[in-house]
Design a protein with these regions (language model features):
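Structured beta-strand-rich core segments of catalytic domains in phosphoester-bond hydrolases
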Residues: 85-191, 197, 314-315
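Acidic/histidine-rich helix-loop elements
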Residues: 36-64, 153-170, 201-210
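Metal-dependent phosphoester-hydrolase catalytic domains
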Residues: 139-141, 222-234, 240-342
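Active-site-proximal beta-strand elements of phosphoester/diester hydrolases
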Residues: 31-50, 54, 144-148, 189-199, ...
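N-terminal, active-site-proximal structural segment of metallo-dependent hydrolase catalytic domains
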Residues: 2, 18-105, 112-129, 216, ...
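Active-site neighborhood of phospho(di)ester-bond hydrolases with catalytic His/Asp-centered motifs
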Residues: 81-83, 110-114, 234-238, 264-267
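Bacterial N-terminal signal peptides
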Residues: 6-15
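Active-site beta-strand/loop signature of hydrolases that rely on acidic residues for catalysis
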Residues: 33-39, 68-92, 134, 179, ...
């Protein structure tokens, strides 16, 4: 009997070692799935839909919230860069149809008010076209973070928001939020930035110039003040600039004067044959709001340093809204990729 007992203990011990080794392999998984998505805030939806005669009212935020939830679940990403977060989406009002409530407790949100820089909660922090970060708590943990502004003159304001704006630099509320994060499965630390750049003209200064300055400020500040050299990083944003436009081409694509060598995930995936079906056939990240056709712009981008790109795609699907009819959840399409820490 004693011999059988020792054999039994040995079997259990070997099994435990085997299971432990398997769990260890899972825990060391070096991949992370990321997304950038402009959600089209409730205020902008209402203003646009009310001004048009051919826009389906199911595109208001409240009836569209269930479509947005389906899209987010379909994407199944570990971390999101969201743009245009307002009170209805975050849940300061209309809590039952807020994306924050619908997604549930498995996700954490990090936002700082683009009005005064305070961290946003249910009771504090003003929101308007606010960029933010949403992440799966079982995969990513937050270490620290903050906000800087894209619309200020860096020589005068040092990227601190002021009530007035220099027309050459655009809307002072345009901002980038950043976070230093830990990827739990691999134990890797990385930086994640979410931003929304300008698409308007101010005081006779044209959109291209304003957008150029936003692009310059974003990349320069991230390079010199936010991300340390040697740490993996991701910039996921609505740049409001195509790859061929001056803002992106001059200040985003050109790495020659920067410490960091960020690269566009789309271009990496295209060159390596890792584009998804939709991105390969139709690399467009916007629709025309009336849903009659796709847009022609690819203005939402993910930039990386310190990662291998495993795949990249764009979700151009429609989802069921409150009345059962199918619509695009936003006027943008979500851009997503699977990355591997190098």
């Amino acid at each position: 009997m004693r011999g059988l007992f020792y054999i039994f203990l040995l079997v259990i011990r070997v099994g435990a070692v085997s299971c432990s080794g398997q769990d260890s392999d899972i825990q060391k998984d070096p991949t992370i799935k990321v997304c950038t998505y402009n959600l089209w805030c409730a205020h902008s939806r209402t203003k646009f839909i009310n001004s048009q005669s051919d826009i389906d009212p199911q595109r208001y935020w409240k009836p569209s919230s269930c479509a947005m939830l389906s899209a987010i679940r379909d994407l199944d990403c570990d971390i999101f860069a969201f743009q245009e977060i307002g009170d209805s989406i975050y849940g300061k009002k209309g809590v039952e149809t807020s994306l924050k409530k619908l997604l549930g407790g498995g996700y954490e949100w990090k936002l700082w008010s683009n009005y005064d820089g305070t961290e946003v909660s249910q009771t504090s922090g003003k929101l308007s076209y606010t960029p933010g970060i949403c992440y799966r708590k079982s995969v990513v943990s937050f270490l620290d973070g903050g906000i800087f502004w894209l619309g200020g003159n860096p020589a005068k304001a040092e990227f601190v928001r002021t009530e007035s704006f220099d027309p050459e630099y655009g809307d002072p509320k345009r901002a980038c939020v950043w976070a230093r994060m830990r990827h739990i499965p691999s134990g890797k630390t990385f930086y994640f930035l979410s931003a929304h750049l300008d698409t308007r003209s101010f005081s006779g200064v044209s959109y291209p110039i304003v957008n150029e300055q936003n692009c310059r400020n974003l990349m320069a500040h991230a390079d010199t003040h936010i991300v340390p050299v040697g740490v993996p990083s991701i910039i996921a944003a609505d740049f409001n600039s195509k790859i061929t436009q001056s803002g992106y081409a001059t200040y985003v694509a050109d790495n020659s004067d920067r410490r960091h060598k960020w690269e566009n995930v789309y271009e990496i995936a295209k060159d390596s044959g890792r584009l998804g079906t939709t991105a390969a056939a139709s690399p467009v990240t916007m629709n025309d709001k009336n849903e009659k056709k796709l847009g022609t712009s690819m203005i939402d981008h993910i930039l990386v340093e310190g990662f291998e790109v495993l795949d990249y795609d764009i979700n151009q699907k429609k989802y069921k809204t409150a009345d059962g009819s199918e619509h695009y959840p936003s006027d943008h399409f979500p851009v997503f990729a699977t990355l591997k820490f190098k």
